[in-house]
């Protein structure tokens, strides 16, 4: 089972309630996930390197983190936003979202050089997500963590799929997908 590590207080903030650990474990059980570990970056660093001094340990965050095992088919739960949304829906605090595919006013073109990519990754899919903000560093870090979890799990350590994300506002079209020789 994949595991997602979430800041407890941030999760409770998104759920709109502070739970005791027992209450949260029960919520996890009822929802179908398992609270696997309660830790912190500080505790992990301390456990992994017994030789760290108190001064060296000061740089590690002591915020409580929950490591939650999620079912292998629930990739939406591998980030703070997905877990919080799913739990809020389960608790009846939020309705299931409805997403709409919108035709763009201007289409962008991706050129695929299939001669170089067919043997390595024969498929290429692109999407533009608008209205996404990464101003909150927690959201950006969660997004990067989700991308990494997907790479490690469903993408089979990038052997099947590699996900690239780019800020379209900082790029100029023409886009080309091709395979380059290793350096």
Describe the predicted segments one by one.
Residues 1-183:
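RNA/tRNA-interacting regions in translation and RNA-turnover enzymes
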